[in-house]
Regions:
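Active-site glycine-rich loop that binds ribose-phosphate moieties when present
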Residues: 31, 55-58, 72, 79-83, ...
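Catalytic cores of soluble, metal-dependent hydrolases
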Residues: 1-47, 54-69, 126-130, 134-243
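Short acidic donor-binding/metal-coordinating loop in glycosyltransferase active sites
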Residues: 51, 77
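Conserved donor-binding loop and adjoining core beta-sheet/short helix segment
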Residues: 106
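Class I SAM-dependent methyltransferase core
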Residues: 48, 74
């Protein structure tokens, strides 16, 4: 529908999975970072299928070594800026707090869309804002097209390198029930496509789609949605020809 031809204009390859240690989170984070260090020795833009949102931290670490600080378009029900989670400094709910602390993000070029989780307080979102993030809570997205918002996003993130991170729980569980931390009142599938298509023209240096959980996805609809959104992300990568 967008006339994008990613397979006709890019060299696209599935390079397989990263063999993590499922019993040691910190070791897995190390393994992922080392794998992406090797991947990024080549002229590639990695588009990654998670896994939970922990994976984004080691990927951003590797990307920082090549591109420096990056802007971020982050779609999620949760801000993922906890200082600790289950007593741990590194977990799926702490990713972007650690990324800020480690200097991986250009904070004035970060946008978070769809935040709404019941477990958060206003202060949690305010922490993001004090860092320079543009925070778009879910209720700001209800009953409307997000095309105007994405014009603001493109202006915010500008011409520098940008990473796109899409947590499937940013979408309402009516469409994406197969995830570990579903939250009502989320984005629609159409809005998700508007967000991704609105990233066309950005200097995307990587992206991921995370938190699809097949054991919770009894109908397969969430996996289908995730696969389609990954394809939408592929269609907005730099170098894709539109015919």
């Amino acid at each position: 529908a967008t006339d994008a031809a990613p397979f006709g204009s890019l060299s696209v390859a599935d390079i397989g999975g990263v063999a993590i240690s499922t019993f040691n989170l910190l070791d897995s984070v190390r393994i992922i970072e080392e794998a992406y260090d090797e991947i990024l020795e080549h002229d590639v833009i990695p588009l990654t299928m998670g896994g939970d949102h922990t994976i984004t931290l080691p990927i951003l670490r590797a990307i920082h070594k090549k591109h420096g600080k990056v802007g971020l378009v982050h779609i999620d029900a949760h801000a993922d800026v906890n200082d600790h989670m289950f007593g741990e400094k590194i977990a799926h709910g702490t990713t972007f707090r650690r990324a800020v602390e480690e200097g991986l993000l250009d904070c004035d070029r970060v946008v978070q869309i769809g935040l709404r989780a019941q477990g958060y307080t206003a202060e949690d979102f305010n922490w993001c804002r004090t860092q320079g993030f543009r925070v778009v809570q879910a209720e700001e997205c209800w009953h409307k097209s997000l095309a105007p918002l994405m014009a603001e996003v493109r202006e915010k993130v500008g011409n520098g390198p940008v990473y796109l991170s899409f947590d499937i729980d940013g979408i309402d569980p009516a469409w994406a029930p197969g995830t570990g931390t579903p939250e009502i009142g989320g984005l629609t599938t159409i809005q998700a496509m508007e967000i991704i298509r609105g990233c066309q023209g950005l200097d995307l240096v990587g992206g991921d789609l995370v938190e699809v959980s097949p054991p919770y996805d009894t109908t397969g609809n969430t996996s289908l949605l995730g696969a389609n959104l990954l394809y939408e992300m592929l269609c907005v990568m730099p170098g894709v020809v539109h015919r």
